[in-house]
Amino acid sequence: MTNIQTEAQMETELLKQLEQLGYQYVTIANEADLLANFKLQLERHNKIAALSDREFDQILNKLQKGSIFDKAKTLRQKKDYTRDDNTVGYIDLIDMFDFCQNTYQVTNQVTIDGKYQNRYDVTILINGLPLVQIELKRRGLELKEAFNQTNRYERHSYGAGYGLFQYIQLFVISNGVNTKYYANSKISARSFEQTFYWTDTQNNQITQLKDFTYQFLDTCHLSKMITKYIVLNESTDTLMVLRPYQYYAVEEIVKRVKESDENGYIWHTTGSGKTLTSFKTSQIITSIPDIAKVVFVVDRKDLDYQ
């Protein structure tokens, strides 16, 4: 008889693997535990003294406001709060520049009470905030079941309490043999067609959860994807994550800019997201200190708007 790995076994193996990659396992049963851990990580990340209850409540009230898209912008901004002595303090939620210099934790089976009670499989926390949700299904089940499950979480419980689960940037769905990722957004903008397999540089799909974890969920790579390779589309209020071939193209262009004065080009087919690749490349290059100006040229007016 074939030994079919259960969902619970898959979850246990994933947690062990993530700990090997440098994630700290933390027990978080509910929102109260989540908030207590977030407060501690926020203080450590910003190297500040312990926040008073009043100060922390201020911060939580600011973080609670807005849609998924608004919270994605908040994640990337410095936030202010009034200290008990009436001076102004500032906090960062994530290091956008030295993206490896963040704190990585993992937990599982967090239960949140909203319209319905939901218990999530595996949650990756960066500086105490839940930024990646991994939904697992046992081998043999369709991957779309995991996709639909994350949509139910959004409808039923992600916005409950202080709504910190709406800070999720990426979802990972897997049945062990097929594994895909996609960006968080409002439910009306989500589509199973916009879930992607990760690949290597030769475009070989990495479908097994174990292999995907080693490559995509490596702490530095994951935070690079979140800080560098998610685009906030203001025209549609949605988050867009680059596909692997776009990621590798941008990485090579940026490398060429940093290391050489020679020209180069990237070849993409129609409908492959060339404009997004070009935009993200330009955005990253503008952050290089030695680059004074980046000229972004399009050949049609509709691309300029896009």
Could you describe each region identified by the protein language model?
Residues 2-298, 302-306:
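ATP-dependent helicase/translocase motor core
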